[in-house]
């Protein structure tokens, strides 16, 4: 089981957004991933270094590159909050 995968919930541990939860939307390469807060918190869709993320055990079923509406729907269906 890879620690950083599409759909994995993670906490940002570095930078001004530290402490915010995000969802991994795409794995760019071994060092960077695309994350989003899906409009549920102030984290916009952006590229992040995997060293700045701490993965959580929760995961939602989304497709690679899913838009924010699909991520938000998957989070609501799974009963997971990003706040």
UniProtKB/Swiss-Prot annotation:
The keyword Ribonucleoprotein applies. One of its GO terms (biological process) is translation. Pfam families: KOW. One of its GO terms (molecular function) is RNA binding. It comes from the Archaea. One of its GO terms (cellular component) is cytosolic large ribosomal subunit. InterPro entries: KOW (IPR005824), Rib_uL2_dom2 (IPR014722), Ribosomal_eL14 (IPR039660), Ribosomal_eL14_arc (IPR023651), Ribosomal_eL14_KOW (IPR041985), Translation_prot_SH3-like_sf (IPR008991). Belongs to the eukaryotic ribosomal protein eL14 family. This is Large ribosomal subunit protein eL14. It comes from Thermococcus onnurineus (strain NA1). The lineage of its organism: Archaea, Methanobacteriati, Methanobacteriota, Thermococci, Thermococcales.
């Amino acid at each position: 089981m890879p620690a950083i995968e599409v759909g994995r919930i993670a906490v940002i541990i570095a930078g001004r957004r530290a402490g915010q939860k995000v969802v991994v939307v795409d794995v760019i390469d071994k060092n960077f991933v695309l994350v989003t807060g899906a409009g549920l918190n102030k984290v916009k869709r952006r590229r992040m270094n995997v060293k700045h993320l701490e993965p959580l055990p929760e995961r939602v079923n989304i497709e690679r590159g899913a838009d924010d509406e699909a991520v938000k729907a998957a989070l609501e269906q799974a009963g997971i909050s990003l706040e």
